[in-house]
Amino acid sequence: MMAERVIAIGDIHGCAEALYALLEIVDPTSADVVVALGDYVDRGPQSREVIDQVMEMSKLCEFVPLAGNHELMMLDALSNSNAHKIDFWLHCGGEETMASYGGDVANIPDSHVDFLKSCRRYHEIETFFFVHANYLHHLPLSHQPDDVLFWQHLDDVPQPHVSGKTAVVGHTPQLTGNILDLRHVICVDTFCFGSGWLTAYDVLSGELWQVDKTGNVRLDSQW
């Protein structure tokens, strides 16, 4: 049975109040597919609470969590004694994540680590595909390199993908707070951890929901 809605959620970055408010207005059901585009952690103050929330989302809908580069950095730091890799993660927002766990790695539940490890590289449906950051237009999704899939910004807009599907991505913050819609690629990272919004976007209908990091809903007349 085809989903009633296929909803992409942009980069959350530790903004649990925004995620809670967004889910309240989107109200996902078992008839919906929700694809989270990664970067649940870092920068915002509530990474632990965000992971708690997203781990519960499979009870509400068909939930597809993608991995972002910040999840990769966190997992790399937790599994590695290399001081450079740990410092790199902390500098990129990991300090806020650690603070949400009381500043102690021992407070990070195994279930949270297991969730981060379970996040997918990509997801695709008939006419759309979802990745965290970017893609190489000539390669199938299964052959995309990590540095592009998780790290490459949209500074150089990719050509339409060989599959003919529209790409839905996060990672490149849209500082205006508005989604970037180039027809063949749509970016829904709208800078929630800064002065923007957390966005949910139904790719089937084009319906859009946005809240700021304190949970205020953006009204239609504001965009």
Where are these regions (language model features)?
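Residue-level marker for buried hydrophobic side chains located in beta-strands
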Residues: 8, 34-36, 65-66, 129, ...
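Active-site glycine-centered loops adjacent to acidic/histidine catalytic or metal-binding residues
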Residues: 11, 38-39, 68-69, 171, ...
